[in-house]
Amino acid sequence: VIFNNHVLGMVRQWQDLFYGKRYSATVLDDQVDFVKVSEGMGAKAYSVDTIEEFEKAFKEAIELNIPCVIDCHIDREDKVFPMVSPGAAISEAFDREDLNNKK
């Protein structure tokens, strides 16, 4: 499953949460067609924009029992958790609830 917000998502998320929203070099103007790349490598691929489309693709992918990729288009401002702070170890990963508790 690809959470595709058409930017370098985790880098932008770091810039948003830890660097005062000072965005630099994160917007991807030339988009990768993840469906074509996946199909070129022999996987079944889906492109989805809604939760309903995702649920249908996910169910089919599980039933097929072959390599599948689901390219989920999400809003540029959506956050993805869990995540790791810059310079932190994977054992220090945190989720949205941890972030909210720090505020």
Question: Which residues make up each language-model segment?
Answer:
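Thiamine diphosphate
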Residues: 1-103
